[in-house]
């Protein structure tokens, strides 16, 4: 009898004996968990690459290199992971284009540069925040989806008591156990997603803040450059 009890209460047995609704809930949560883990690894690698590229480009930028030379280097060998490089290229390209126009007002040049860099920052912000809405959704909804599966399973367990002459704990325990697995899977999917979302949100805000700081400093350099040459 003991092997039968062990088999009846094993994890796989509980899942396979669950109702179709509970199994669908479990399958949905497992799929959400697997997808969120894939996105967690992808976002983690992307964030590390973006920070590494930012540090490397700022080191080159503040090394005293000529801005035109740096622009040519960035254009000939662009780094797709370097958001700050894209911001620099957008700003300097607009600066060079407007400066070539005869009689253009210096303030109009700087307004164009600021506008171009704001657009570039917005694009980089979208890249950094990719997948974060999905992680937030998984983290906030998975426990409730799991709870729905649990409630449904417990309801089925108690409905099954109507066909039993004598209700005992052994009668309802397997049904309740299989229902609680849905809640466990929901928490397993939600907890990593919430942690990853908070961590990546903080990293994204830090990188975006540094992008804005770089843009302000770069604008200050171009402002001096355009007004000095104008004088």
UniProtKB/Swiss-Prot annotation:
GO CC field: plasma membrane
Where in the cell? Cell inner membrane
What is the protein's membrane topology class? Multi-pass membrane protein
Q: From which domain of life does this come? A: Bacteria
List where the protein spans the membrane.
20-40, 134-154, 176-196
Keywords of this entry = Cell cycle, Cell division, Cell inner membrane, Cell membrane, Membrane, Transmembrane, Transmembrane helix
- Its Gene Ontology biological processes? bacteriocin transport; cell division; protein import
InterPro entries the UniProt entry points to: ExbB/TolQ_transport, MotA_ExbB_proton_chnl, Tol-Pal_TolQ
Record-stated family: Belongs to the ExbB/TolQ family.
Q: What does this protein do?
A: Part of the Tol-Pal system, which plays a role in outer membrane invagination during cell division and is important for maintaining outer membrane integrity.
Q: Which NCBIfam families match?
A: tolQ
Indicate the quaternary assembly: The Tol-Pal system is composed of five core proteins: the inner membrane proteins TolA, TolQ and TolR, the periplasmic protein TolB and the outer membrane protein Pal. They form a network linking the inner and outer membranes and the peptidoglycan layer.
What this protein is called in its record is: Tol-Pal system protein TolQ
């Amino acid at each position: 009898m003991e092997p039968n009890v062990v088999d009846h209460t094993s994890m796989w047995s509980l899942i396979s004996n669950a109702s179709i609704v509970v199994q669908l809930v479990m399958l949905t949560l497992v799929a959400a968990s697997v997808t969120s883990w894939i996105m967690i690894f992808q976002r983690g690698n992307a964030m590390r690459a973006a920070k590494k590229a930012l540090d490397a480009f700022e080191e080159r930028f503040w090394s005293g290199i000529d801005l035109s030379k740096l622009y040519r280097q960035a254009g000939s060998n662009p780094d797709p992971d370097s958001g700050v490089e894209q911001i620099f290229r957008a700003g300097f390209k607009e600066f060079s284009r407007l400066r070539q126009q005869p009689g253009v007002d210096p303030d109009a040049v700087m307004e164009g540069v600021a506008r171009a860099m704001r657009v570039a920052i917005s694009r980089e912000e979208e890249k950094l925040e990719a997948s974060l809405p999905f992680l937030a959704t998984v983290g906030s909804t998975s426990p409730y989806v799991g709870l729905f599966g649990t409630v449904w399973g417990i309801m089925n367990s108690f409905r099954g008591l109507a066909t039993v002459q004598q209700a005992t704990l052994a009668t309802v325990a397997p049904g309740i156990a299989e229902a609680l697995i849905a809640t466990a899977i929901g928490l397993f999917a939600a907890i990593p997603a919430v942690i990853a979302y908070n961590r990546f949100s903080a990293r994204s805000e830090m990188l975006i803040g540094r992008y804005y700081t770089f843009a302000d400093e770069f604008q200050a350099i171009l402002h001096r450059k355009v007004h000095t040459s104008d004088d």
